[in-house]
């Protein structure tokens, strides 16, 4: 009897592909919706996750690491290098909690799927006039056009991150008067390396330009007085390529007055971008920004 006929008669199922197994396990672990998008021609399989809870993304990251799947923020603004392999896009739209925090200073804690219309309605004027359906995660990932050294104008006070290795960490004010410690060994290694990079020749060349031309805002480590260093500003404009944003603490900020322009980038900006990417995501868990401005969107 032929092996295929024997398997049919005995009720054996054909062996699943790793991608099918990945999707099956993802659907079992996550409360949100998982959708197979099929094959991207010449690149690889694609799927979409709409998480119902923060833990869904943590489960997805772990499975992506196990199966070699890149995890991307859905509708993030690139340009991105092509992902030659499996890709899971995550739509944070269901993670849309927004709460004003107690205290005399107006502050809000927002999940990544909060639409900008809701933030503007709450009184956060830095979102006035922006696309109301854009999510906070997409806004944070988009090119950040605040003037050099003035990332504090964004109103971002702190970000809760899921890092490439699965560590969850909060980045925020960083100085002698700030009492929130860096809890994880991952970030305790990351932050000194970023400060060293900020003091090097690549960052100096970017600071010598009329405006900060690099996509990643390493100038956040040398803010314009009276602002002080806030590590949360490192993810402004990150494109979803450095970490997954679980939540953001916001104050009232200002709309950027600069315009993001690829033409303003000095030649050292690409090398600086690659160094920062390697520090945050040495495993390639997230997409990579394209070296050229005419790269693809995912």
Question: What spans do the regions from the language model cover?
Answer:
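N-terminal basic/disordered segments at the start of proteins
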Residues: 1-44, 277-278
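General beta-strand structural signal in soluble alpha/beta enzymes
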Residues: 3-5, 9-10, 33-37, 49-51, ...
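Glycine-rich N-terminal segment of FAD-binding domains in flavoprotein oxidoreductases
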Residues: 28-102, 106-112, 120-124
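Substrate-recognition/cap regions that form aromatic- and gly/pro-loop-enriched pockets
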Residues: 60, 64, 68-70, 257-268, ...
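FAD-binding subdomain of flavoenzyme oxidoreductases
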Residues: 124-255
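Activity-critical C-terminal alpha-helical subdomain
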Residues: 266-298
């Amino acid at each position: 009897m032929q092996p295929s006929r024997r398997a049919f008669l005995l009720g054996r199922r054909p062996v699943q592909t790793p991608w099918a197994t990945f999707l099956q396990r993802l659907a079992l672990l996550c409360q949100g919706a998982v959708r197979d998008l099929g094959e991207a021609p010449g690149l690889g399989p694609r799927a979409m996750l709409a998480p119902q809870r923060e833990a869904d993304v943590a489960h997805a990251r772990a499975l992506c690491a196990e199966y070699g799947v890149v995890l991307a923020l859905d509708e993030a603004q690139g340009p991105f290098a092509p992902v030659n392999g499996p890709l899971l896009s995550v739509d944070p739209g269901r993670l849309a909690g927004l709460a004003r925090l107690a205290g005399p200073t107006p502050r809000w804690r927002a999940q990544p799927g909060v639409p900008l219309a809701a933030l503007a309605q709450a009184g956060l004027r830095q979102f006035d006039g922006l696309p109301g359906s854009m999510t906070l995660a997409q806004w944070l990932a988009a090119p950040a056009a605040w003037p050099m050294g003035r990332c504090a104008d964004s109103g971002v006070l702190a970000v809760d991150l899921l890092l490439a290795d699965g560590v969850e960490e909060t980045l925020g004010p960083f100085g002698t008067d700030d009492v929130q410690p860096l809890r994880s060994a991952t970030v305790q290694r990351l932050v000194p390396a970023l400060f060293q990079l900020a003091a090097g020749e690549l960052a100096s060349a970017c600071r010598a330009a009329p405006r900060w031309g690099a996509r990643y805002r390493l100038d956040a480590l040398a803010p314009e007085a009276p602002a002080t260093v806030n590590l949360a500003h490192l993810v402004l404009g990150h494109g979803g390529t450095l970490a997954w944003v679980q939540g953001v603490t916001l104050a009232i900020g200002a709309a950027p007055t600069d315009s993001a322009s690829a033409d303003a980038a000095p030649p050292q900006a690409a090398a600086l971008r690659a160094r920062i990417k390697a520090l945050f995501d040495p495993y390639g868990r997230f997409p990579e920004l394209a070296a050229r401005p005419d790269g693809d969107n995912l």
